[in-house]
């Protein structure tokens, strides 16, 4: 019975949207390869967060990614992963939040890494970095936030580039303070 429960828990972690330690957060499947060191923004945020900005780094591939979040418990926090070069900072408009992600993986010098990301807000604004995969559906992952959720950060694997990436969804705030 214990073996069956362990196998089921492993399956849930590797497939579909799953809950993290704080049950108010959910994760999408990770896209990419096994290289680099693990990271997880779920420790850098809490319920009621507001996503204020994105930091997207890279040219032909995704070399770095970060978010700036504001929440009631830590005021402002900006977890960042990968290489902080060739970056574009995107300030979200007040009350804007990310509802959908698309990640493409690519194989370079025998390493699988993230080659392209697209983030879509509820205002139909699109934010992208990298180059789209030409491998068809293979290596492409899309995920939409559950109803009442928004992008809260990321998890995956990185060093001087992003090797694997998944979205972390957090609940929308009950009240939106003025953003400025």
Curated annotation (Swiss-Prot):
Top-level taxon of origin: Eukaryota
SUPFAM superfamilies with a match to the protein in the record: Mannose-binding lectins
Induction: Expression is up-regulated at later stages of infection.
Places the protein is found: Secreted; Host cytoplasm; Host nucleus
Cross-referenced Pfam families: Jacalin
Xref: Gene3D superfamilies: Jacalin-like lectin domain (2.100.10.30)
Entry keywords, A to Z: Host cytoplasm, Host nucleus, Secreted, Signal, Virulence
InterPro entries (alphabetical): Jacalin-like_lectin_dom (IPR001229), Jacalin-like_lectin_dom_sf (IPR036404)
Keyword Transmembrane helix on entry: no
Biological function: Effector that partially suppresses the tobacco programmed cell death induced by cell death-inducing proteins.
UniProt note: domains: The RxLR-dEER motif acts to carry the protein into the host cell cytoplasm through binding to cell surface phosphatidylinositol-3-phosphate.
Family classification: Belongs to the RxLR effector family.
Name of the molecule in the record: Secreted RxLR effector protein 19
Lineage: Eukaryota, Sar, Stramenopiles, Oomycota, Peronosporales
Gene (name only): RxLR19
């Amino acid at each position: 019975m214990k073996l069956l429960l362990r196998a089921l828990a492993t399956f849930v972690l590797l497939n579909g949207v799953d809950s993290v330690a704080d049950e108010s957060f959910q994760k999408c499947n990770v896209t990419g390869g096994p290289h680099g060191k693990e990271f997880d923004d779920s420790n850098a945020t809490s319920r009621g967060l507001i996503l204020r900005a994105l930091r997207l780094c890279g040219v032909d591939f995704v070399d770095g990614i970060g978010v700036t979040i504001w929440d009631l418990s830590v005021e402002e926090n900006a977890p960042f992963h990968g290489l902080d070069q060739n970056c574009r900072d995107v300030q979200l408009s007040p009350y804007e939040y990310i509802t959908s992600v698309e990640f493409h993986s690519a194989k370079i010098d025998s390493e699988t890494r993230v080659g392209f990301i697209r983030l879509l807000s509820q205002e139909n604004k699109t934010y992208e970095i990298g180059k789209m995969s030409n491998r068809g559906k293979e290596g492409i992952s899309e995920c939409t936030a559950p109803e009442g959720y928004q992008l809260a950060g990321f998890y995956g694997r990185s060093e001087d580039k992003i090797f694997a990436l998944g979205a972390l969804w957090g609940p929308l705030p009950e009240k939106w303070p003025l953003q400025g």
